[in-house]
Amino acid sequence: MPIKSDVKKGKGVKIPFPKLVNLYGCRLGKQVFVGPFVEIQKGVVIGEKSRVSSHSFICEGVEIGKEVFIAHGVMFINDKFSDSKKTGRGWKLRKTIVGDGVRIGSNATIFPVRIGKKSIIGAGAVVTKNVPPNSIVKGNPAK
């Protein structure tokens, strides 16, 4: 499992098991932690002091703020398919924006949305709509 040469890492980034991650063309801010069995795809930006726990998947088009905690097994999905537009080069992917200080519980699934700063996403939540700042959401769909 590779860390590609196009990955940009800020000072103090910690990847304790570099052979157990897939990182492609992403940008990791200062003091970011990436656990084992994580995949982070091209174009993803992760703000400083954020933590991505093991077995998580972060797809293209995701921007994560500073001091965000992503628990074990979180999946970011960048296409709802039902309302995506096909382009000449394939599907047009939608963005996901995660604000500073957000906490995302284990096994949550995050679709293309905006999650406001300091919000909490419960374990197992399926987030299909934007989350205002300072909110707590849980369930399927998350409310």
Predicted segment positions?
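Internal alpha/beta core interface subdomains
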Residues: K117-I120, A125-K129, P133-N134
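Conserved beta-strand-loop-alpha-helix hinge in the C-terminal portion
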Residues: P133-K143
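Flexible, glycine/small-residue-enriched loop-and-beta-strand segment within the central core
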Residues: P2-D6, P16-L28, F33-I115, N140-A142
